Amino acid sequence: WVLALFTTIVVLFLFLPLVVVVAFSFNSGYSAFLWGGFSTAAYGQAAHDTTLVTALKISLEVAVATGLLSMFVGLVGGLAATGTRWTHRLLFVLFIIILATPEIVGASGDLLWFVTLGVSNGFVRLIIAHSIFGSALTALIVRGRALGLEPSVFEAANDLGARTPTMVRTIAVPLLMPALIAGGLLSFTFSLEDLVTSVFVSTAQTTPLPVYILASLHSQFHTDIFAIAVFIFISTTLLFLAALAAMGGGSRSRMRRGLRVLGATGAAEGG
């Protein structure tokens, strides 16, 4: 019973804040923190609040761009960090440093960098700043996956006459796709909820949702904020489950399919 009690406490500690947010999104009270009865009016108010919807749209656009950019940079960086030379190991250490650096330090550096270079576009600043963390995270995930690949696969591809770019395209990338999807999804999620970096690099014309919520705390915090939070929570959860379903299994089939493609390519070239 001790283990059951401890498990219950841990579950409540982790999920009770989410339950409170969902419950208070149906609050009919004027204040978000005082229960006034059950109502779905907050969802209608959130949908018609143009400022709130604009902030959500900016966050989603930046998060999507961050996820895609992090997947590309993370793939290249992750493969480069799998080598045994000192430069490859240095790249791996740099990725670790990026993740270990306090966010406020990195955000300050990003702001100084953008001001020095004269980058004033808020979208560009947000995407680049968020992608620095996302790319490092994706690169480490890709590296871990790449180190677990069987060398015999690439030896077989080499016996079929495949060149390195062909092996990367037909073997490595399909096998690394689960890691890429995971890295892109995590980068999307971290970008969507990032506050510290967004406060430093965003502009008045490109205010993402976390910055908007922070500003609302200093004025009037209404229940429509909770409604948007529930929407984001459900959306990201469904997206995460879909990614898990896409990543589940299929590694061996992707491997066999890649080798068949290489075999067909080699036969065609030989003919």
Question: What do the PLM-derived regions correspond to, one by one?
Answer:
Residues 1-5, 81, 85, 143-154, ...:
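C-terminal transmembrane helix and the adjacent membrane-cytosol boundary/short C-terminal tail
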Residues 5-18, 131-132, 139-142, 150-151, ...:
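Transmembrane alpha-helices
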Residues 15-29, 107-118, 185-190, 243-244:
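A structural signal for multi-pass alpha-helical bundles of membrane permease subunits
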Residues 54-61, 109-137, 178-179, 184, ...:
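Loop-to-helix entry region at the N-terminal start of transmembrane alpha-helices
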